[in-house]
Curated annotation (Swiss-Prot):
The keyword Endoplasmic reticulum does not apply. This is Tryptophan synthase alpha chain. Its EC number is 4.2.1.20. It is an enzyme of class 4 (lyase). GO terms for molecular function: tryptophan synthase activity. Belongs to the TrpA family. The active site is at residues 49, 60. It comes from Serratia proteamaculans (strain 568). The lineage of its organism: Bacteria, Pseudomonadati, Pseudomonadota, Gammaproteobacteria, Enterobacterales. Pfam families: Trp_syntA. Pathway: Amino-acid biosynthesis; L-tryptophan biosynthesis; L-tryptophan from chorismate: step 5/5.
Length: 268
């Protein structure tokens, strides 16, 4: 959890926001997936948000669903994903690493065992996309027990009670939804979110990172101007993988360009 605090402190002192890319572990195959993650870090990613492939990803649009299918086609398993996470942590010791996933994968070997394994491989945070705050108690208790930050989604229509609960129980960062619906770049991020950001700050929430529909530098700047601490981009990155995975060198070059341009927008 401390890695997020250290990151946000460093960015604040540099007057920068955070740029956080999302990719699915094992997409398009384990070896290339690790190269992709190294490329994201080298191009300027401030933290990583990583998915474990899941067969029924309710919160995801077609782009990220396709990423899971590519990973499955290459034989990726949850066990292998944790081995990859350990390798990523070893290579990038100070980088905050978050998982964005679904409850079935947490239940598979038991909630406590899941968070224990996260701690062993150096994961900093876990966001479970299909567990609403009201059902989160056993997950967040296990997370805290093992030193993992429980991440909560703040939807655009959050009422005051939910904002207080998220602020009280969330750690690491707060996932601020640009809009309702599933992930994807087809629906652009909708702003402003000033009122939510102001309330989260008033209730001492973990710093908000805006996600869903973030695909261009102007949207990163808009998120920061609305008071967010940074932005998360998933579908736009996964689309680059989808369109270029048969040409790895071209894919890595395009990913590096995209991330460096998005990161540059956090300094504007």
């Amino acid at each position: 959890m401390e890695r997020y605090q250290q990151l946000f402190d460093r960015l604040a002192s540099n007057k920068e926001g955070a740029f956080v890319p999302f990719v699915t572990l094992g997409d398009p195959n384990p070896a290339l997936s690790l190269q992709i993650i190294d490329t994201l870090v080298e191009a300027g990613a401030d933290a990583l948000e990583l998915g474990i492939p899941f067969s029924d990803p309710l919160a995801d649009g077609p782009t990220i669903q396709s990423a899971a299918l590519r990973a499955f086609a290459s034989g990726v398993t949850p066990t292998q994903c944790f081995e990859m996470l350990a390798a990523i942590r070893q290579k990038h010791p100070s980088m905050p690493i978050g998982l964005l996933m679904y409850a079935n994968l947490v239940f598979h070997k038991g909630i406590d065992a899941f968070y224990q394994r996260c701690a062993e491989v150096g994961v900093d945070s876990v966001l479970i996309a299909d567990v609403p705050y009201e059902e989160s108690a056993p997950f967040r208790a296990a997370a805290i027990r093992h030193g993992i930050a429980p991440i909560f989604i703040c939807p655009p229509n959050a009422d005051d009670d939910l904002l207080r609960e998220i602020s009280s129980h969330g750690r690491g960062y707060t996932y601020l939804l640009s809009r309702a619906g599933v992930t994807g770049t087809e629906s652009r991020a909708q702003l402003p979110l000033h009122h939510l950001v102001n309330k989260l700050r008033e209730y001492h929430a973990a710093p908000p990172l805006q996600g869903f529909g973030i695909s261009e530098p102007a949207q990163v700047r808009d998120a920061l101007q609305a008071g967010a601490a940074g932005a998360i981009s998933g579908s736009a990155i996964v689309k680059i993988i989808e369109q270029n995975h048969t040409q790895p060198a071209e894919m890595l070059t395009r990913l590096a360009t995209f991330v460096s341009e998005m990161k540059a927008a956090t300094r504007a």
